[in-house]
Amino acid sequence: MTKEIHKKLHVLIVEARFYDGISDALLKGAVRTLQKAGASYDIVTVPGALEIPGAIAFAEKNSKVFYNGYVALGCVIRGETYHFEIVANDSCRALMDLTVHKHLAIGNGILTVEDEKQAWVRANQDEKNKGGFAAEAALCMIALKKRFGDNH
């Protein structure tokens, strides 16, 4: 992606703060990627991954601010109950529904992992940098929307 493609872009980062340290690492990666691309951004915080799609939907429908795209950041770590599957599947499905049915450019940076060690490897900028990857995905989807003539 070139900086020219991202000129004047404004992105909303929605971060779930269930795991504060991991959330911080994901956010740093996303912010750094958006800054390098020259995109401006706002950040809103929600309690957990299930609330991320709702926050994006609220922003899209009710916000007085126009967002070209969205970055979803969070972490779901498998526990001893079925709750992991519900949160992982439903948060991802809801983001896909927003992308497909509402034509939103969303980068999904919700980690779904077995343990905290896997989460840290994926969140750290000097390792997998999934926060940065989610921001880059959002920027790519914004560019793709523009390519197909959708400027909203």
Swiss-Prot record:
(2S)-2-hydroxy-3-oxobutyl phosphate binds at residues 80-81, 122. It holds the Pfam family DMRL_synthase. Gene3D superfamilies: Lumazine/riboflavin synthase. GO terms for cellular component: cytosol; riboflavin synthase complex. Its EC number is 2.5.1.78. It catalyses: (2S)-2-hydroxy-3-oxobutyl phosphate + 5-amino-6-(D-ribitylamino)uracil = 6,7-dimethyl-8-(1-D-ribityl)lumazine + phosphate + 2 H2O + H(+). GO terms for biological process: riboflavin biosynthetic process. The active site is at residue 83. Pathway: Cofactor biosynthesis; riboflavin biosynthesis; riboflavin from 2-hydroxy-3-oxobutyl phosphate and 5-amino-6-(D-ribitylamino)uracil: step 1/2. Coiled coil: none annotated. It is an enzyme of class 2 (transferase). Keywords: Riboflavin biosynthesis, Transferase. Belongs to the DMRL synthase family. NCBIfam families: lumazine-synth (TIGR00114), PRK00061.2-2 (NF000814). PANTHER family: 6,7-DIMETHYL-8-RIBITYLLUMAZINE SYNTHASE (PTHR21058:SF0), 6,7-DIMETHYL-8-RIBITYLLUMAZINE SYNTHASE DMRL SYNTHASE LUMAZINE SYNTHASE (PTHR21058). Catalyzes the formation of 6,7-dimethyl-8-ribityllumazine by condensation of 5-amino-6-(D-ribitylamino)uracil with 3,4-dihydroxy-2-butanone 4-phosphate. This is the penultimate step in the biosynthesis of riboflavin. HAMAP family: Lumazine_synth (MF_00178). This is 6,7-dimethyl-8-ribityllumazine synthase. It comes from Bartonella quintana (strain Toulouse) (Rochalimaea quintana).
